Amino acid sequence: MKFTGSPLLWPSWLPLPAPPPPLPSVTRRRDPRTVGKRAAITDACDVGYGAGTTGGSGGTTTTVSTPAQFTAAATSDEKAVIVVKGAITGATKVKVGSNKSIIGRAGSSLTGVGLYINKQENVIVRNMKISKVLADNGDRIGIQASSKVWVDHCDLSSDKKNNGKDYYDGLLDITHASMAVTVSNTYIHDHYKGSLVGHSDSNSAEDTGKLYVTYANNHWYNVASRNPSVRFGNVHIFNNYAEKLETSGVNTRMGAQLLIESSVFSDTKKAVTFLDSKSTGYAVVNDVDLGGSTNDRPQGTFTKPDYSYTLLGSSKVKAAVVGTAGQTLTF
């Protein structure tokens, strides 16, 4: 029915109603933690020196939940994506073969089980929580004489409160002329020895001109030293947040060339320094908040890597990295 009458008029003897209050202004932000959780088990590395690492993509996919299943899958010669489900506990070092992706489901873990990547290539370790690997079984992740390795969204730790510094070994060591390695979005915490690049002062013949490593968007917390420690290598560190480093932060030695950008140190002794070697290394430091600590190293010559990357800016690093780094992905 079509209404054709006159429009209703507000009576002149009534006061006009007050206008409604304005709607609150809402600024919507994209939550980086939500975005960071979107992932696929076939993702390839797209950041840093390890870019292009594809792991087991294109091979078989297998889900493992026991030490025996995990060891068999990781050591095989076949290209494979290995999905870790649940908690796996042991006291061993598992040798990881080439063309593997080791992917942790949310809530999965390796306790007492270290990963050993030696003379291999094209390996991805992603969303893995690894802890309490005894020194006799090596590092949480040990990379030797290998190339194209991507460690992403991992949680690496130990039990620092109850044991001395040599009860466990390092959390993540990259040695023996390894090349094209990226460590990204990883939570490195509660340990004495964080991450070592280059294992010995006497290994210059093998390591010089090698050890190209990128550390991007990592959170370092309550680690005494090696955050990281670098001999001989060329290492790019950007968008990292480090706190409670009781002995030292970044240690550059034996001629290492470091580029440190868009990063923050908090409650740290000797943020960028030189310790425990015959000769110093070098560091170019851009937009780094030392948090009242010091950078006492000479400036080097490494000013730009041969890949593109995005700097968050030191003022934005903490909000972007804390709570996002670590085992935070779902697949």
Swiss-Prot record:
It is found in: Secreted. The keyword Lyase applies. The keyword RNA-binding does not apply. The active site is at R226. Ca(2+) binds at D139, D169, D173. SUPFAM superfamilies: Pectin lyase-like. SMART domains: Amb_all (SM00656). It catalyses: Eliminative cleavage of (1->4)-alpha-D-galacturonan to give oligosaccharides with 4-deoxy-alpha-D-galact-4-enuronosyl groups at their non-reducing ends. GO terms for biological process: pectin catabolic process. Glycans are attached at N99. Keywords: Calcium, Glycoprotein, Lyase, Metal-binding, Secreted, Signal, Virulence. Its main location: secreted. Transmembrane segments: none annotated. It comes from the Eukaryota. Acts as a virulence factor active in plant tissue maceration. This is Pectate lyase B.
